[in-house]
Amino acid sequence: MREHFNDGVEFARFLAHRFVTDKAPNSAAALTYTTLFAVVPMMTVMFSMLSLIPAFHGMGESIQTFIFRNFVPSAGEAVETYLKSFTTQARHLTWVGVVFLAVTAFTMLVTIEKAFNEIWRVRQPRRGVGRFLLYWAILSLGPLLLGAGFAVTTYITSLSLLHGPDALPGAETLLGLMPLAFSVAAFTLLYSAVPNARVPVRHALMGGVFTAVLFEAAKTLFGLYVSLFPGYQLIYGAFATVPIFLLWIYLSWMIVLFGAVLVCNLSSSRLWRRRSLPKLIVLLGVLRVFHQRQQLGQSLRLTHLHRAGWLLPEDEWEELLDFLEKEQFVCRAGGGEWVLCRDLGAYSLHRLLNRCPWPMPSRERMPASLDEAWYPPFQQAMERLQVEQEALFGESLAHWLADGTSGAKVT
């Protein structure tokens, strides 16, 4: 039990480190800024899509009220009034204004995809038709699915009102869980569809549940803070709603991006526990696997590397690929696979050590043994090198910098 608890704590630390490394707070700030400009266009597009289906006529306002009631703290009530007014005015825009709103909505989706691709270490973002179709699906199918879900909720409510609370057993509980269910569905769809990477549905669902629960908890705590510490009203007066709403948007995006970090790393949860090896040794191991598969006329992907015993997380794999591609060791073969495109017989280890951005490991960091045929002679060579370095540079700095030491003096 204690071991599982320690593993959980270590995994949480790992996620927090990845969250900061992936610049998620900066991405959340950028998304907050974009949301300010995109929230009205998104709502306008939603109302436009719902108006195309006669059964959903007049449902847009009800959905907007539902969203603010269940997904925004009580401080957002004043903002809801302003947004309703802005959205109503936006429906009377000319076609030039409509195009501008559509571009603004697409900009928000581009920012979301960029943040997710940063977390998933995606090297090749979507382009052209693929990106347009994804965004169009989100802007068109999203409101329709939301409208369908809201129609089901309305039906359950009316059934209970007309035929009594016993008409549908558990209807009250079901209605109470609807906001959470909508959140889970939305986050699951977001995590599975937006990154330009393969995301297992099971992991996306787990991340959706985690994010939805965290979102509900944050909404409750944020509402308590606003009600118990109203000092911001003394500072901002009539404008107090604006900074509070901005803070809530930023906090919401922080939660969404942390959920994305969780989903991304669920597939590599067994890899973070491994004892980290010096990057130089990992690089040599990866080159050995590349060389071996080159002899067989085969390409390499991360799963092949795992089967060979090198359990690299995806971010470390991408980091190594960046160096190997820059040094023209490997070339992309398509489908996420890579091939060795350089003759290793014409490239010395000395040259690799000079070009490698990672330092040579100290004796303490070198593993005692490694199931690789090349490692024992490499380990001996590194030990000899360090002995020679200590013999040459073992004297104190005072000895080297004292007056009268050998060596030319720069004038």
Swiss-Prot record:
Q: Which NCBIfam families match?
A: yihY_not_rbn
The record gives the membrane topology as:
Multi-pass membrane protein
What does the UniProt keyword field contain? Cell inner membrane, Cell membrane, Membrane, Transmembrane, Transmembrane helix
Subcellular location(s): the record lists: Cell inner membrane
Q: Which GO terms describe its cellular component?
A: plasma membrane
Q: Which family does it belong to?
A: Belongs to the UPF0761 family.
Looking up HAMAP family in the UniProt record yields: UPF0761 (MF_00672)
Major location, coarse class?
membrane
Full protein name: UPF0761 membrane protein PLES_43641
Q: Where are the transmembrane segments?
A: 36-56, 92-112, 132-152, 174-194, 207-229, 244-264
